[in-house]
């Protein structure tokens, strides 16, 4: 197995090490977001918070797009390059590190811009959405899949999301996400609010090849057996608060530049 950078025992550090990223709704929500954004063959798409490159690969292979992916994690970008090379799509994708609140791109560069479970973790969500709008061409769509409180949560659930998923900034409800998109100058803003669904979540695995899944399991097991800090991390986060997903869901938010 190719040696990877030393693992950070953090929510994103673990994902980068194992080679897996996820968002609520899995591949089913990715496909729905693509359809809502009208993404199709020949389009140049920006995938903000691209993680290990699973959505980028899907856009290239299933929709004939060119994709630029950006992520703040060097470990994620390393895995994304590995995936692109393994799947023979390295000529259709570009991956680089960067900050969603200050994107390293010219204005009006992309036909569409998407973000899946990324802005949830960003301090200034309004500024980030404004950046997504800035780099999107006129008439292009900006699409988000982001965690959303379905109703005001009790304190214990806010604490759990902060401690488990390292969501350091308050999650908004649906109306706030939409208002930020309007403030960024996006038009025809629409949203679809979704509750946790185990069947839909099961489509996470379809974002990966069987070899990827095997490597993820091997890396996870190796980390669990060899790293006491990781074992403590898992133990402390094993139990979900009762009724969490009565409160926590996600929304698909789309607006036109």
State where each predicted segment sits.
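Conserved alpha-helix/loop element of class I SAM-dependent methyltransferases that forms part
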Residues: 23-41
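Class I SAM-dependent methyltransferase SAM/SAH-binding core
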Residues: 46-48, 52-102
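A short acidic, Gly/Pro-enriched loop at the edge of an enzyme's catalytic core
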Residues: 101-112
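A short SAM/SAH-binding and catalytic strip from SAM-dependent methyltransferases
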Residues: 112-124
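A short glycine-rich, Lys/Arg-flanked "PGG" loop and its adjoining helix->strand segment in the class I
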Residues: 126-141
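Short, glycine-/aromatic-enriched active-site segment of Class I SAM-dependent methyltransferases
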Residues: 147-168
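Short alpha-helix
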Residues: 170-184
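Conserved Class I S-adenosyl-L-methionine
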Residues: 190-257
